[in-house]
């Protein structure tokens, strides 16, 4: 790139930026104007000086000796006759029509009763189909009924224990005879403890059921991975060495928006080279679908695309398209691709900006699709790697150690009616185009408009159309990156929170499979559990205050012989507390046991992986209350209509400044201190039960800052703490990504917009990638304007005739 040279400010400096010999520059040094220079570069007469720069675009692009642009026939002419780069394949449009959402069951019922029916569905080439009854469907239904019984049974038993722990039993302190003869305040004071207890018991039941679901998912995942006898795993459908037929073309699409350009194209290049090494590159095309609206980044993307094509000889295989109108964010970006080029491909693999996939993984996904004709989506389990901050490395360790259990457990319960996470997955193109286009949600407010979290919805629509959605949890070669620090992760969580709350409006949409209704529910509970937990703690504190401050009444009746003593069952409290701890932390212990059984060398050895697990558990305890408060605020913000910003996440290691941490965590620290003082004043012994919450809140500032430090993360890696196999023995794709990222940052293009105007090569590239759509648009506007003029004249003439 030309970043090493200063921005040209004169004609001579402009010449210095051109890759020419000294003799060639000497020949052009006599030019007195830029128009004359461009005319001589183009080697053809230019009648309009304003068009001189455009005339020399082709020459400026191909000045480099042995330039591949001409060899690859990448130069063409657009609709206005200007030279352009063939950055995209020819457009062959396919109809993409979203079905309007009918979310109101009352309206649907009324239309059915009145005989009006519902609006017709969009027409497709073939109707949605139901697959033949397969054995895995019956097995999946039975398994999910068992899961429901286990969750509810556990919750009922725990709720019974919780009821026995609470201090006020059986409405014994309320006299029904006295209620009619006492004031409203007296009645409220008597009823308040029981109202608080009932609310606490209800919240406890919901939260315990949520924890129970995670426990049984992890437990079944542990058994699946330990035995290795999963006969329903999708990865067993292919032998792995079948030739991919010529017609099974796959598009790898990477939607990006204002991303870290060096990292994006480093991962893309590593993936491209890995696919090329398999010998099946002719079955794949790569698309970078940009929604970038920052001009400097957009120019850098164009140059990075040209560089990676030249370095990999990827012209005609790696394409770049930037949208001018960012409709429907990422889902709209994919819709636009499907509409233009989707009909040319049988499959599509969606990548995130930080995704890297091996060629073996990608070719295996295509083979699995070919071997499973009823599969609509096959999702891989991406492995997190590539970050160096202490926070990111602990999260990488957690996802690498605990994640396989939960992913395998999800597969055990869901089978072919599973999740799609929006990236690192292969999609069957035809049913996706016909059934998975997303219409905006009807209505107004924060939960209307374009769908934000599109992945769960697309999976639900694919299953509704009769296609399977699978998780290939044991397929290696799929990688992603995590946010570098807590605050960046929380920014991402706010977007996901809003998107999941929006998706719940589709819970009762007609035709959705019960499993995907449950997916919508679990998506909401991922964030709604935070305010429920917070309210549970607040109500528990309120009950403590009532129990402490209200004068106890031991005799309700005038001649009552025996007092009514408050009840306390410490054995039930200890049993319930121990059970909850087991449900929360046993999956982590099982993960480490599985690593011991399979081999702990890649995690630093048995001792190091065990110590890392204990440190991660401590860290998760410290962060859980912090996330609780943030997620509570996110949920309230969504219901209050506060917009969530959808900026690109931080992709590079970045530490949190102390000022930023104080600003974000200061209110939490103050809340934790005040809460601790209040509980200590009410009942000092109860503070021990609340200590994990209030201490974590008071330590949130230093924990957030210290965990974001890169030097601590690197030191932990050197000592083999929080080590993952991708660091112990990194695959070639990750090695290449790191190397290319370093090289790209060294040559990163700065001041892209200015260079696109004054730098000869950047200007030529920007002109060659510009479209002539504005020309056709001007003609269209002229036609519309002329028709409107004729119409207005006709109206005036008819009006004059009537008046006459």
Curated annotation (Swiss-Prot):
Transmembrane feature ranges: 146-166, 200-220, 519-539, 576-596, 610-630, 686-706
Membrane topology of the entry: Multi-pass membrane protein
InterPro entries: Glucans_biosynth_gluTrFase_H (IPR023725), Glyco_trans_2-like (IPR001173), Glycosyltr_2/OpgH_subfam (IPR050321), Nucleotide-diphossugar_trans (IPR029044)
Function: Involved in the biosynthesis of osmoregulated periplasmic glucans (OPGs). Pathogenicity factor. Required for both the expression of disease symptoms on host plants and the development of the hypersensitive reaction on non-host plants.
Enzyme Commission number: 2.4.1.-
Protein name: Glucans biosynthesis glucosyltransferase H
UniProt keyword Cell inner membrane present: yes
GO biological process: glucan biosynthetic process
Pfam families per the UniProt record, alphabetical: Glycos_transf_2
Pathway listed: Glycan metabolism; osmoregulated periplasmic glucan (OPG) biosynthesis
Keyword Transmembrane: yes
Keywords noted in UniProt: Cell inner membrane, Cell membrane, Glycosyltransferase, Membrane, Transferase, Transmembrane, Transmembrane helix
Primary location group: membrane
Subcellular location: Cell inner membrane
Family: Belongs to the glycosyltransferase 2 family. OpgH subfamily.
Top EC class, one word: transferase
Gene source species: Pseudomonas syringae pv. syringae
One annotated GO molecular function: hexosyltransferase activity
A GO CC term assigned to this protein in UniProt: plasma membrane
């Amino acid at each position: 790139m030309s970043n090493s040279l200063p921005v040209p400010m004169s004609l001579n400096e402009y010449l210095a930026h051109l890759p020419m010999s000294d003799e060639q520059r000497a020949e052009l040094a006599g030019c007195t104007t830029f128009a004359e220079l461009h005319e001589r570069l183009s080697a053809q007469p230019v009648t309009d000086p304003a068009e001189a720069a455009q005339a020399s675009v082709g020459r400026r692009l191909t000045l480099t000796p042995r330039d591949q642009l001409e060899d690859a026939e990448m130069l063409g002419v657009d609709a206005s006759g200007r030279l352009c780069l063939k950055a995209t394949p020819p457009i062959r449009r396919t109809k993409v029509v979203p079905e309007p959402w009918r979310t109101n069951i009352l309206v649907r019922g009324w239309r059915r009763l009145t005989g009006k029916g519902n609006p017709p569905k969009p027409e497709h080439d073939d109707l949605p189909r139901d697959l033949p009854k397969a054995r895995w469907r019956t097995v999946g239904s039975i398994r999910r009924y068992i899961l429901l019984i286990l969750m509810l049974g556990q919750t009922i038993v725990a709720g019974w224990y919780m009821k026995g722990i609470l201090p006020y039993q059986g409405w014994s302190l309320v006299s029904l005879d006295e209620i009619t003869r006492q004031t409203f305040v007296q009645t409220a004071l008597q009823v308040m403890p029981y109202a608080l207890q009932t609310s606490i018991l209800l919240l406890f039941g919901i939260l315990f059921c949520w924890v129970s679901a995670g426990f049984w998912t992890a437990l079944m995942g542990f058994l699946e991975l330990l035995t290795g006898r999963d006969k329903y795993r999708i990865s067993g459908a292919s032998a792995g060495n079948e030739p991919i037929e010529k017609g099974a073309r796959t598009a790898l699409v990477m939607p990006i928006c204002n991303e870290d350009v060096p990292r994006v194209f480093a991962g893309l290049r590593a993936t491209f080279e890995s696919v090329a090494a398999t010998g099946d590159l002719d079955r794949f095309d790569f698309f970078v679908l940009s929604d970038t609206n920052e001009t400097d980044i957009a120019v850098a993307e164009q140059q990075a695309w040209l560089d990676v094509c030249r370095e990999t000889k990827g012209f005609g295989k790696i394409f770049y398209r930037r949208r001018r109108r960012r409709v429907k964010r990422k889902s709209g970006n994919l819709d636009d691709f499907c509409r233009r080029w989707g009909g040319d491909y049988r499959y599509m693999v969606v990548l995130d900006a930080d995704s890297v996939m091996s060629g073996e993984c990608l070719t295996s996904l295509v083979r699995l699709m070919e071997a499973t004709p009823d599969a609509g989506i096959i999702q891989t389990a991406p492995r997190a790697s590539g970050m160096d901050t202490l926070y990111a490395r602990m999260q990488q360790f957690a996802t690498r150690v605990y994640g396989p259990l939960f992913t395998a457990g999800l597969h055990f319960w869901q089978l072919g009616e599973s999740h799609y996470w929006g990236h690192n997955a292969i999609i069957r193109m035809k049913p996706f185009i016909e059934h998975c286009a997303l219409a905006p949600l009807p209505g107004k407010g924060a939960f209307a408009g374009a769908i934000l979290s599109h992945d769960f919805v697309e999976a639900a629509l694919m299953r509704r159309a009769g296609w399977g959605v699978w998780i290939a949890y044991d397929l290696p070669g799929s990688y992603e990156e995590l946010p570098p620090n807590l605050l960046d992760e929380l920014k991402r969580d706010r977007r996901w929170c809003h998107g999941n709350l929006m998706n719940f409006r589709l819970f009762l949409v007609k035709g959705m499979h019960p499993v995907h209704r449950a997916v919508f529910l679990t998506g909401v509970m991922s964030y709604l559990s935070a305010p429920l937990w917070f309210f549970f703690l607040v109500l528990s504190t309120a009950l403590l205050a009532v129990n402490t401050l209200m004068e106890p009444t031991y005799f309700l009746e005038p001649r009552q012989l025996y007092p009514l003593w408050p009840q306390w069952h410490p054995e039930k409290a200890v049993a319930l507390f121990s059970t909850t701890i087991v449900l929360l932390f046993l999956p982590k212990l099982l993960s480490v046991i599985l690593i011991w059984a399979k081999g702990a060398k890649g995690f630093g050895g048995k001792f190091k992986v065990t110590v890392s697990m204990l440190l991660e558990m401590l860290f998760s305890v410290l962060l859980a209350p912090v996330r609780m408060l943030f997620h509570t605020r996110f949920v309230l913000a969504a219901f209050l209509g506060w917009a969530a910003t959808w900026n690109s996440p931080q992709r590079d290691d970045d530490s949190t400044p102390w000022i930023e941490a104080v600003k974000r965590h200061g209110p939490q620290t103050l809340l934790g201190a005040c809460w601790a003082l209040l509980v200590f004043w009410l009942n000092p012994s109860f503070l021990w039960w609340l200590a994990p919450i209030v201490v974590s809140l008071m330590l949130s500032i230093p924990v957030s800052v210290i965990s974001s430090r890169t030097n601590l993360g690197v030191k932990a890696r050197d000592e083999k703490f929080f080590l993952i196999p991708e660091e112990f023995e990194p695959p070639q794709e990750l090695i290449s990504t790191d190397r290319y990222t370093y090289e790209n940052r060294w040559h990163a293009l700065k001041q892209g917009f200015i260079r696109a105007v004054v730098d000869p090569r950047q200007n030529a590239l920007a002109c060659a990638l510009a479209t002539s759509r504005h020309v056709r648009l001007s003609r269209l506007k002229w036609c519309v304007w002329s028709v409107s003029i004729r119409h207005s004249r006709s109206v005036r003439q008819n009006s004059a005739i009537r008046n006459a």
